[in-house]
Regions:
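Surface-exposed loop and turn segments in beta-propeller and other repeat-based domains
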Residues: 466-468
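Short, solvent-exposed loop/turn elements at domain surfaces
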Residues: 204-206, 393-399, 534-536
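Bulky hydrophobic/aromatic "packing anchor" residues in well-ordered structure
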Residues: 195, 385-388, 404, 533
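Aromatic, loop-rich ligand-recognition surfaces of beta-strand-rich domains
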Residues: 248-258, 263-379, 395-463, 473-532, ...
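Mature catalytic domains of secreted/periplasmic carbohydrate-active enzymes
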Residues: 1-318, 324-339, 350-362, 367-369, ...
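Short hydrophobic/aromatic segments of transmembrane alpha-helices and their interfaces
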Residues: 187, 216-217, 390-391, 401, ...
């Protein structure tokens, strides 16, 4: 899937709709077409081809002008769906910010959907479509209970807002398919989940992230918590400035591929491909190949007959006793169950609860080599917080710089966060980490960052002034200034919360600065780098 146009509006193909495209680029003297080159490469190597087209366009003058922009957008979509052969997937997100005129656009999703069905009827429509839905985060983690048969009405339908509101569900809801909620729904949709995550901390290439490519252990954990949780996995790989995938990313992808092949190439379960129609409370035993060391079990339902398993129990038999290995809920297309390694003689799968009869298509037993995360530690700042002093009496503000992303400073109102660093600094940037739990209230979207020598006279630092996409990807945002700003005080001024609420929250804030010579009465200078915050596989932070 190629990002043919992102929110900046720049088109990677020679569109007739705007000059803001490869036509105006020195690359190939304006005669290049990135989309076509990728399409040809996909055909050459037997890969399916998909496009991402951002509906939000911060460059188009007609954005925010209703029908004018919808016609403009559908014309771009039409070019992509008619000039590049078969398109297997069309991917939209729901981003809907302001355009260059300060206005927001109301998208005509039904007209967009009709265009796709007319031009590429076999294409899968993802996220803002009705074939594949967004899992609700960009961390690479799916729900442990994931129903593909769901009550969530796809957002492209005009009735979606009313029906979803009536049920109290939205894309991030934990329960999208339990019996209770299905009984209250007017419609049920086959709407499987897609887990989206980047191999790097961000979605675009930055050389400073070359050492922060996700570790093999982290990628393997993502695989088990996405594909292994009845979801499909979309792994973002950003090309570098040469147009190629960076060698660090390539190396990790090869390691990841080898790990998955080695894990699943040998199935230690005998007759695991035997189909089984399982009613609630029924069990099936499987013999295990002699002396096999195992730690992973796979279950698949025949989804052509629906998704029906609600809960299951997995047991292993050795030394004359049955022992519980794992318990779980939904299965769907695929469920991967990890457990402590053992050498069982037999495996027993019990379907504790199912909707009518569950159609078990396949089971398997494997050994996944344990991995250790040796990835580089994420540095949230290099200015020690030990000298920081708060401006005010609210001591709970210290939660915002206690080196723990799980503690959060929360307050009513858009409250300015002000700190005295304890000495002068040449400040070069900062980091902002939003809350890492399900409560994102108070997450800062738009902001102003200022520095001061005396705490009274403030200078505004030149920044974009917004944490883009933080609503959908609430991870640490790093802001690096083009110049340094000398000051002893800094303040982060919230201008807008992600949902327009009057509240503020900060899980962690860090400051980057150039080390200064110590004064006569000072012995400490800012270390570069400083002691980083250590994060482990499975932590919410990237």
């Amino acid at each position: 899937v190629i990002t043919a146009k992102h929110h900046d509006g720049f088109c990677l193909w020679p569109t007739k709709t705007t000059r803001h495209s490869v036509v105006s680029s020195p690359w190939k003297n304006g005669k290049g077409d990135v989309v076509r080159e990728l399409r040809n490469a996909c055909k050459k190597y037997g890969l399916k081809f998909g496009i991402y087209l951002s509906p939000w366009d911060r460059n188009a003058e007609c954005y925010g002008q209703g029908d004018a922009y919808n016609r403009f957008f559908i014309e771009q979509l039409t070019e992509l769906l008619t000039n590049y052969g078969e398109v297997h997937e069309v991917w939209f997100d729901g981003a809907n910010g302001e355009g260059p005129n300060g206005k927001k656009q109301i998208y005509d999703w039904e007209a967009i959907e009709r265009t796709i069905r007319r031009l590429q009827p076999k294409a899968v429509t993802a996220v803002m479509g009705d074939d594949v839905r967004w899992v609700g985060n960009e961390k690479g983690i799916g729900r442990k209970t994931e129903w593909s048969a769901t009550v969530l009405t796809p957002g492209i339908y005009s009735r979606a807002i009313g029906q979803n509101k009536e049920l109290g569900v939205f894309g991030k809801s934990k329960d999208l398919g339990s019996r209770d909620i299905v009984a209250r729904a007017k419609e049920l949709f086959w709407f499987p989940s897609e887990v989206d995550v980047s191999i790097r901390p961000g979605w675009f290439y930055h050389s400073k992230e070359d050492s922060h490519v996700k570790s093999l252990a982290h990628l393997a954990d993502i695989y088990f918590k996405s594909v292994g949780y009845n979801s499909v996995l979309l792994l973002n790989i950003p090309p570098d400035k040469s147009g190629l995938i960076h060698e660090n990313d390539c190396r990790r992808l090869k390691e990841f591929s080898t790990y998955l092949k080695n894990t699943f190439e040998k199935d230690y379960l005998k007759r695991g491909r035997t189909r089984w129609e399982a009613l609630s409370g029924t069990s099936k035993e499987y013999m295990v190949r002699k002396d096999a060391l195992v730690n992973t079990f796979m279950i698949q339902e025949d989804i052509t007959k629906g998704q029906r398993v609600e809960s299951f129990l997995l047991e292993g038999y050795w030394d004359g006793n049955w022992r519980t290995l794992a318990e779980g809920t939904t299965v769907g297309y695929k469920r991967l169950v990890r457990f402590t390694e053992c050498q069982p003689e037999k495996i027993r799968l019990t379907i504790r609860s199912a909707r009518n009869a569950a159609h078990i298509l396949r089971t398997g037993l494997f050994y996944a080599r344990p991995l250790t995360d040796n990835s580089a530690k994420v540095q949230l700042g290099n200015v020690p917080v030990s000298q920081w002093r708060l401006s005010g009496t609210d001591e709970t503000m210290r939660k915002a710089f206690d080196k723990n992303v799980q503690t959060v400073w929360r307050t009513e109102g858009l409250k300015t966060f002000t700190v005295d660093l304890g000495r002068d600094a040449e400040i070069t940037g900062f980091s902002y980490t939003p809350a890492q739990d399900d409560n994102l209230a108070g997450t800062i979207y738009k902001y102003r960052f200022e520095v001061s020598m005396d705490g009274s006279h403030w200078k505004t630092c030149a920044t974009s002034g917004e944490f883009s996409n933080i609503m959908h990807n609430p991870v640490t945002c790093f802001v690096h200034f083009e110049q340094s700003y000398r000051g002893r005080f800094f303040r982060l001024v919230p201008l807008a919360e992600i949902s327009g609420k009057p509240c503020t929250s900060i899980a962690e804030i860090g400051i980057f600065a150039v080390a200064l010579p110590a004064k006569d009465d000072e012995s400490a200078v800012y270390p570069v780098p400083g002691a980083p915050l250590t994060l482990k596989v499975g932590d919410a932070h990237p």
